[in-house]
């Protein structure tokens, strides 16, 4: 043992949340200007005697904080992974249901050619499946590691048994063992954040698309609405896309936090706290916001009202114009594609200018 077993047993016995006054810890932390020293002193006092001298033995503050944050991050990851499965299942069901629901496709915000709503949803589904795959790869990449390596990560204070101690502790905690110290290497957190950022971007895009399709003049979808919900304090008739706006709006703070996580890569020497502490702000926000988006998206899609009649009306709004590509290729079989394009282009421009089909 690195420390006496009696000391280890006493430390385990006393290291309970209920044994600490967090207001006192906060006060001492502010006075000492150190994030962990107050807890170390409080635990030493709880343990007492000679055994108390072995509290925080061999490790450094960043070992404790990094390992603790990684445990929280892994717990958040597992929640996100579970909720992602529900989201994908919900979207897959909706996609199958609307595989033949005709609508107009839009490019640059303008009517293009016919598609199905199921086709649009399939693209979203494929993107979400890629995010799910990236999430699972985080485990394969050993992103969730702990750190029990001492002052500069060299195990100098473990009497030659540092790796042995680290492996035993991290096995107990369910974290992977790093190849070497990662105190100055924050790429794992940045990788985690970037994967979640991509996921959030997809959900933000879905939210923005649904926001557009729910506009009064388009009216192709509606988010779930319960009796008694209020859209406006001054306009009683309003049914606003409140859930959809919430889905879309959370992507921006996630993106900002992902950028903050990348700043934490810029560590000086063996470690510093200039950028390291960014993680304390960014990681909880990224995981919380993304999970809220996933849960929100699942609810929206599970109760989405699809106005198939309006989709068909919008498809037919410009008469035969959405079929100009097909007509061009049919004509092109005899005249050539470029010649056919010019002929159909002239006819289409005339129809648009004279408001004809």
Name each model feature, range by range:
Residues 2, 9, 13, 27-32, ...:
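Glycine-rich cofactor/substrate-binding loops
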Residues 97-100, 134-137, 141, 175-179, ...:
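Conserved helix-loop functional segments at active or binding sites
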């Amino acid at each position: 043992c690195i420390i006496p077993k009696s000391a280890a047993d006493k430390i385990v016995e006393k290291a309970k949340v209920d044994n600490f006054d967090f207001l006192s810890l906060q006060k001492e932390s502010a006075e000492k200007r150190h994030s962990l020293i107050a807890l170390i002193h409080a635990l030493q006092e709880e343990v007492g005697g000679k055994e108390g001298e072995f509290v925080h033995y061999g490790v450094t503050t960043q070992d404790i904080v990094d390992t603790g944050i990684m445990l929280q991050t892994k717990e958040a990851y597992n929640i996100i992974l579970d909720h992602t499965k529900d989201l994908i299942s919900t979207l897959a069901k909706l996609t199958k249901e609307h595989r033949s629901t005709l609508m107009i496709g839009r490019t640059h915000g303008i009517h293009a050619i016919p598609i199905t709503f199921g086709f649009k949803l399939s693209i979203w589904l494929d993107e979400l499946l890629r995010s799910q795959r990236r999430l699972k790869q985080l485990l394969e990449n050993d992103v969730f590691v702990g750190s029990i390596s001492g002052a500069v990560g060299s195990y100098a204070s473990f009497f030659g048994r540092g790796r042995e101690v680290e492996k035993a502790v991290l096995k107990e905690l369910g974290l992977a063992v790093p190849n070497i110290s990662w105190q100055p290497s924050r790429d794992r957190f940045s990788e985690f954040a970037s994967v979640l950022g991509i996921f959030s971007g997809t959900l933000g895009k879905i939210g923005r698309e649904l926001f557009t399709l729910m506009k009064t003049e388009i009216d192709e979808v509606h988010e779930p609405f319960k009796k008694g919900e209020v859209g406006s304090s001054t306009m009683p008739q309003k049914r606003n896309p409140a859930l959809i706006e919430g889905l879309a709006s959370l992507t921006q703070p996630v993106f900002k936090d992902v950028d903050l996580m990348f700043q934490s890569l810029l560590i000086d020497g063996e470690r510093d706290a200039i950028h390291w502490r960014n993680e304390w702000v960014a990681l909880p926000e990224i995981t919380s916001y993304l999970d809220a988006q996933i849960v929100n998206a699942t609810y929206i899609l599970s109760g989405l009202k699809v106005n198939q009649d309006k989709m068909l009306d919008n498809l037919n709004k410009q008469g035969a114009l959405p079929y100009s590509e097909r007509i061009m290729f049919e004509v092109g079989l005899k005249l050539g594609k470029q010649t056919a394009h010019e002929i159909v282009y002239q006819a289409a421009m005339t129809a648009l200018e004279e408001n004809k089909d």
